Design a protein with these regions (language model features):
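Class I S-adenosyl-L-methionine
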Residues: 1-20, 24-121, 223, 231-232
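Beta-strand/loop-alpha-helix module characteristic of Rossmann-like adenine-cofactor folds
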Residues: 2-12, 117-251
Length: 251
């Protein structure tokens, strides 16, 4: 989609499990442009780009005093304004730009609407990290991935014959809501899996590694204190649905 003289908007993602997971191609583009705008950029990656002569403008302050939805809208508008008035604009955020990233998906849609030339550099997404972590042979067994809130909205989407990865688990529970907000999700899972089905909570701690806790579906409540913004829930139908004690592992 890029024009001969280069794209007006460039989207790139840094890794979901390591701050330095930024592809060589994305780094080369950042050096070529000489400046980037970024959201949630870790200090190690900012320092790396600075050593390469890239000026980094963080947009995190646009969230100050605003609800998250308004903050995301402000970030998107700031990126689009640069792409339109002072291109090229390169925006770096966590994960793969077109997977589990509402801002970058919106930016792609707006770039197409405004007929802005665009280039996207994929990043290491949470799905990539988890597939590698738990050793899923996606080509053989398949893998159903959907956000927890998306599953609640489309109950018929659940396929108990394939391993299930529920993304954005914390999104089921609005800020300030009680743990009872997870009730409908648990009931939906109980309708498809036995009470003894092992389920694994996976939290991505960035540079701190990945933590896992496995319990039976009947004991979902034991996972509640550990659910955070990075949490995903994995249901591995390859494992026999038998009662087991909670296990924890940190890599």
């Amino acid at each position: 989609m890029a024009e001969a003289d280069g794209p007006r908007l460039v989207l790139a993602g840094f890794g979901a499990s390591s701050a330095l997971q930024l592809t060589v191609e994305a780094q080369q583009m950042a050096v070529h442009i000489g400046r980037v705008v970024a959201l949630g950029l870790p200090e190690r990656l900012r320092a790396l780009l600075a050593r390469q002569g890239v000026t980094v403008t963080p947009l995190d302050d646009l969230f100050a005093g605003r609800p998250f939805a308004e903050g995301y809208a402000a970030v998107a508008q700031a990126v689009l304004a640069r792409a339109e008035k002072d291109p090229p604009a390169m925006f770096i955020s966590q994960g793969s730009p077109l997977l589990m990233n509402a801002i970058t998906r919106f930016l792609v849609a707006e770039a197409l609407r405004l007929e802005l030339s665009l280039r996207v550099f994929p990043g290491v997404s949470p799905v990539d990290v988890i597939v590698a972590e738990v050793g899923v042979d996606v080509g053989r067994t398949g893998l159903m991935t959907i956000s927890a809130s998306g599953l609640l909205a489309r109950k018929a989407a659940l396929n108990p014959r394939a391993p299930l990865l529920l993304l954005e688990l914390a999104g089921v529970r609005p800020e300030g809501a009680s743990a009872e907000a997870y009730g409908p999700l648990v009931e939906l899972l109980r309708g498809e899996y036995p009470e003894s089905q092992p389920i694994t909570l996976i939290n991505m701690g960035g540079e701190g590694g990945i933590t896992r806790a496995t319990v039976a579906l009947a004991d979902f409540g034991e996972l509640l204190p550990n659910i955070d913004a990075s949490s995903c829930l994995y249901v591995d139908i390859r494992r026999k649905a038998e009662a087991r004690k909670p296990t924890e592992e940190q890599d």
